[in-house]
Amino acid sequence: MTKTQMNYIAGDWVSGPTEIENINPSDLSEVVGVFAQASSDQLEDALDAARRAQAEWATYGLERKQNVLMAIGNELMARAEELGTLLSREEGKPLAEGKGEVFRAGQFFTYFAAEVLRQIGDTADSTRDGIEVDVRREPLGVVAIISPWNFPTATASWKIAPALAFGNAVIWKPANLTPASAVALSEIISRQDIPKGLFNLVMGAGRDVGQRLVESPKIDAISFTGSVP
C-alpha cells in the first residue's frame, strides 16, 4: 500500500479529510504517491501558526537566518539527482531537466542566503531642522505562495527563499499535479532551525485551498504564478 504524503502545518505533518493519487504521466501504471488535501480548518490553523511564528522569526539574527537558507540550498544541490528524478516521474520532464531544475532551486536559496547579510537601510537629512530620515525595510508578515506545475521546485524556491530571507512566514500551496516535489522540498525546510509554523505546506485544488488562501484577511502578500479559469 502506498503511504499517504501529508501536509505540513504548524510544525507537524498532518493528514487531510481527502486524498488524491499522483500518476506518472509517462507511465500511467505507476502511482507516484498519494497526497492529503488540506481542509479549510487546517488552512486556518496554518494561517494562525504562521502569524505567531513570523513574530519570532523577525527576532532571529541575520547570520542565523542565513544559515537556514544556506542549508536548504546546499541540500537541494547535493540531492539534485534524486529529487530531479522524482520531479521527472511526476511531471514528465526529461531527467536532465528535472535534475537541473532542482540544482537551480538550490542556487536560489544560497543566493538569498547571501542577500540576508546584505540587508541595508539608509539615512538622509530632513528639510526640517534637527530631524533625520531613517529608511529601513521590514517584513510584510504572512506570505501566500501559489506555484505552478511546470517548474514545481524552481519557481516555488524562487518565491519561498526571498520570503523567508527577509523575515516573512510562508503558506505554500503547490500545484496539485506535482505534490511529490512539494513534499520533498517541504521536508528539507521542516528540518531547519525555524519556528514552528513559519513554513506551511497546504495541498489542495486551486478552487478550494487556493481560493480561500487569496481571500483570507490573514494574508499580507500573495505571490502567484499560474492560470485561473
Where are these regions (language model features)?
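Rossmann-like NAD(P) dinucleotide-binding subdomain of oxidoreductase/dehydrogenase enzymes
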Residues: G121-P229
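Short N-terminal micro-motifs specific to bacterial/archaeal maturation
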Residues: E19, V34-Q37, E56, N74, ...
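Terminal low-complexity tails and localization/encapsulation signals of metabolic enzymes
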Residues: M1-V34, N67, A71, G121-I146
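Histidine- and aromatic-rich ligand-binding microenvironments
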Residues: N7-I9, E21, G33-E44, D193-L198, ...
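Hydrophobic residues in alpha-helical segments
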Residues: Y8-I9, Q54-A58, L76, L164, ...
